């Protein structure tokens, strides 16, 4: 199934989806040293974003979240790509400075954790393998 969205930062990757149905704050929500989701309100608490394609509706929280995304990349525990319904400034800036492919305007309800997906951010597309 091919989902068409909008490129935020380019690149092409394939990997396993890690899907949250709730907005995500990187500041206080993701451990920048390990990549583990630590937000007590998250439906994916305890999961690790490392080498996953992180899928969630939108970001929330402090502007420092952009630097947490960058720190994840510097520490080698960042997601391969970020897919969201709505890109807001915090997560978009983080993806850009970290060089993480990102696409928005995607119906994330069509993606489940564990599915193999390919993100072609240059085209603004997400291909979900069935």
Swiss-Prot record:
Its EC number is 4.2.1.182. Pathway: Isoprenoid biosynthesis; isopentenyl diphosphate biosynthesis via mevalonate pathway. It is an enzyme of class 4 (lyase). One of its GO terms (molecular function) is hydro-lyase activity. Pfam families: AcnX_swivel_put. The active site is at 62 (proton acceptor). GO terms for biological process: isopentenyl diphosphate biosynthetic process, mevalonate pathway. Keywords: Isoprene biosynthesis, Lyase. It comes from the Archaea. Component of a hydro-lyase that catalyzes the dehydration of mevalonate 5-phosphate (MVA5P) to form trans-anhydromevalonate 5-phosphate (tAHMP). Involved in the archaeal mevalonate (MVA) pathway, which provides fundamental precursors for isoprenoid biosynthesis, such as isopentenyl diphosphate (IPP) and dimethylallyl diphosphate (DMAPP). This is Phosphomevalonate dehydratase small subunit. It comes from Thermococcus sibiricus (strain DSM 12597 / MM 739). The lineage of its organism: Archaea, Methanobacteriati, Methanobacteriota, Thermococci, Thermococcales.
